Regions:
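Non-catalytic, topology-defining segments of multipass membrane proteins
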Residues: 1-171, 213-259
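Active-site-proximal inter-transmembrane loops
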Residues: 117-125, 183-210
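Glycine-rich, pocket-lining loop/helix-strand segments that form or immediately flank
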Residues: 174
Length: 259
C-alpha cells in the first residue's frame, strides 16, 4: 500500500511538472513566433524554425497564427477603446481574466478582422490541410503524451497545460493592463512574476512602449525567457533579429514609475 501511494504521488508530481513543461514550450512559441515575430516583425525565422514553431503551436494550442496575429494587431490599433478585443479598461480586469478566451474567439472567427489586420499571412497548403485543424492538432498532442507516458499522466498533464496556458495568457491582457509598474506612459504594466509564467509577456508596459522590439526586458534585472531562446537561435541562424534596441522607446514616452 505504501509503495502504491508513493508511486501514485510521484506520478502526479511528474504529470504536473510535465504539464508545466508543455505550457512553457507553448508560451515560448507564442511569444517568440506569434507575438514578436509574426505580429510585430521584430525578427524573422529560417524555414526549419518557422516549420517547428507551427508544429509546436498546432500540437499544444491549436491556434491559427493568422487569427492570433489579427486579434493582437487589432488590440494595438485600438488599445483600451471599444474596438479593443480584450480591454480591462472597458470590460473590467476580472471579466477579461475569466472571459479572455471567448473574447479572443469572437474576434478571431470574424474573417473581416483577419483580412484587415493579417492580410500578409495568407494560408498555405499545410494550413488548409493540417494546421487549420485545431482539434486534430490538440488530439495528436494528447495522443503523443498517452503513448509516451500513459493515459493517467497524459490526462493530468493535459489538464494542467490547458488551464495554465489559458489563465496565464488571459492574465497578460487582464492583470497586465491593471496591476503593476508603469515605467512608460501607457496603460499596460510590468510584472516580473507574470513574465516568468509567460516567457516574458508580463513586461507588457515595456512592450507597448516599444512594440517592434524583439526584447521585452528593458532593465538589467528583468528576466525575459523568450529573449533567452531568441539569442541562441540567432547564433545558429535559425532567426534574425530586426529590432531589439531600447532606442525604440523615445524619451518623451518615459514617465515616473507607479505601482
Amino acid at each position: 500500500m505504501i509503495t502504491f501511494e508513493v508511486a501514485w504521488y510521484f506520478s502526479v508530481v511528474f504529470a504536473v511538472a510535465l504539464g508545466g513543461a508543455v505550457t512553457t514550450v507553448a508560451n515560448l512559441a507564442t511569444t517568440v513566433y506569434l507575438h514578436r515575430g509574426l505580429s510585430h516583425k521584430a525578427l524573422t525565422f529560417s524555414r526549419p524554425a518557422h516549420g517547428a514553431f507551427r508544429l509546436v503551436l498546432w500540437l499544444t494550442t491549436g491556434i491559427r497564427p493568422r487569427q492570433w496575429v489579427a486579434v493582437h494587431r487589432k488590440h494595438h490599433a485600438h488599445t483600451d477603446t471599444l474596438e479593443d478585443p480584450h480591454s480591462p479598461a472597458i470590460h473590467g480586469w476580472w471579466n477579461v481574466q475569466l472571459k479572455n478566451y471567448a473574447m479572443y474567439r469572437k474576434v478571431a472567427r470574424d474573417d473581416s478582422n483577419t483580412d484587415r489586420f493579417a492580410r500578409d499571412l495568407q494560408p498555405d497548403r499545410l494550413d488548409r490541410y493540417l494546421f487549420d485543424r485545431a482539434l486534430l492538432g490538440l488530439g495528436t498532442g494528447i495522443a503523443i503524451l498517452v503513448v509516451l507516458f500513459g493515459p493517467f499522466i497524459a490526462a493530468i498533464a493535459a489538464l494542467i497545460h490547458i488551464n495554465y496556458y489559458l489563465a496565464a495568457n488571459s492574465a497578460v491582457n487582464a492583470i497586465g493592463h491593471h496591476f503593476g509598474k508603469r515605467p512608460y506612459d501607457n496603460s499596460a504594466t510590468n510584472l516580473q512574476w507574470l513574465a516568468l509564467l509567460t516567457a516574458g509577456e508580463g513586461f507588457h508596459n515595456n512592450h507597448h512602449a516599444a512594440p517592434t522590439s524583439a526584447k521585452l526586458a528593458h532593465r538589467w534585472h528583468e528576466i525575459d525567457l523568450g529573449w533567452f531562446l531568441i539569442k541562441p537561435m540567432t547564433w545558429f541562424r535559425l532567426a534574425r533579429v530586426r529590432l531589439d534596441e531600447l532606442r525604440l522607446v523615445s524619451a518623451a514616452r518615459a514617465s515616473h514609475q507607479t505601482n
